[in-house]
Amino acid sequence: MLQPKRTKFRKVHKGRNRGIASGTEVSFGTYGLKAVGRCRLTARQIEAARRAMSRAVKRQGKIWIRVFPDKPITEKPLEVRMGKGKGNVEYWVALIQPGKVLYEMDGVSEEVARNAFALAAAKLPVKTTFVTKTVM
């Protein structure tokens, strides 16, 4: 699963998921899966969607993952009283804003790409839409 090799700090503040997304254009492939809402994508969700897509295209084409989980999320163990410091890092998330392209695909027909992205979207906690590369 995806996670950073090294980080400057082990734990981070919770923060808020506001603002507008960067990476809103399809830049590597021909087709893309774009987020419509905001959410926190876990590394497990990113990997599950990637597997669903790669199984759907049957080793044809190429898939790009445009998001990376770089924020650590901590949890305290079960039945532990409050206080005594912040919990341990349990998983990593990527903060997603509306308009962010999550995945891209190339080397397959549009019908196959739509089908693969539909399977991937079912694994994700955010509403998504299918986009194509716009050539100026």
Curated annotation (Swiss-Prot):
Any Pfam family matching the protein: Ribosomal_L16
One GO biological process term: translation
InterPro entries reported for this sequence: Ribosomal_uL16 (IPR047873), Ribosomal_uL16_bact-type (IPR000114), Ribosomal_uL16_CS (IPR020798), Ribosomal_uL16_dom (IPR016180), Ribosomal_uL16_sf (IPR036920)
Keyword Transferase in record: no
Gene Ontology CC annotations of this record: cytosolic large ribosomal subunit
SUPFAM superfamilies per the UniProt record, alphabetical: Ribosomal protein L16p/L10e
Keyword Disulfide bond recorded: no
Cross-referenced Gene3D superfamilies: Ribosomal protein L10e/L16
Protein family (similarity comment): Belongs to the universal ribosomal protein uL16 family.
PANTHER family: 50S/60S RIBOSOMAL PROTEIN L16, LARGE RIBOSOMAL SUBUNIT PROTEIN UL16M
Subunit (UniProt): Part of the 50S ribosomal subunit.
Official protein name in the record: Large ribosomal subunit protein uL16
